[in-house]
Every structure is written in structure tokens, then in C-alpha cells.
Amino acid sequence: MTAEHVSRGDIFLVALNPTRGSEIRKTRPCVIVAPLTTGGHPYPFRVRCTFDGKDGHVVADQLRAVDRERLVKHLGRLSDTALNELLGVLQAMFAV
């Protein structure tokens, strides 16, 4: 899979630096919709998930548009259950 074939729910390693202020930093796995983290707290706009054997959260409160050049490597896909929960959180966030 190349960065040209990106689908909702795919997980890519994304180079997020440089950043400003409190933007999420580092090169980290990101769901194509929101970044993933194994740290942090379970805030209302974060969706618990397990990926690559690690428990973490989809950080839906840190949405960011990125250019395809920032996509380092395709890592896999978010589970259907976690993706559906994420889409529900996004609907609540944006009141759609």
C-alpha cells in the first residue's frame, strides 16, 4: 500500500514534527482521521483501541491535516469496532 491509496481507518506512521504549542508531536502511528497514542488520559473525545499488541487511544481532539509526504509507513487498519466508535465520537464533536 502506498500513500496514494489511503482509506479511512488505515493506520500510518506519520512524521508530525515540526509542531507548535500543544500540538501532538513526534513520528507516531495515526489513524487516517486522528493520531494514536499509548500515553495520555481517556478523555471523552479519545477512543480506546488496541493496535500492534499495545493498548492506546485514538486522539480525536488532535485532528490535523497532513500532506502525504508525512506518511512514513502503512502499519495496518483500525478494528471495525474502534473505527465505528471513533466515527461516533467525531459526530458528537461536530454535532452532525
What label would you give each PLM region?
Residues 1-96:
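Conserved functional hotspots at enzyme active or ligand-binding sites that engage polyanionic ligands
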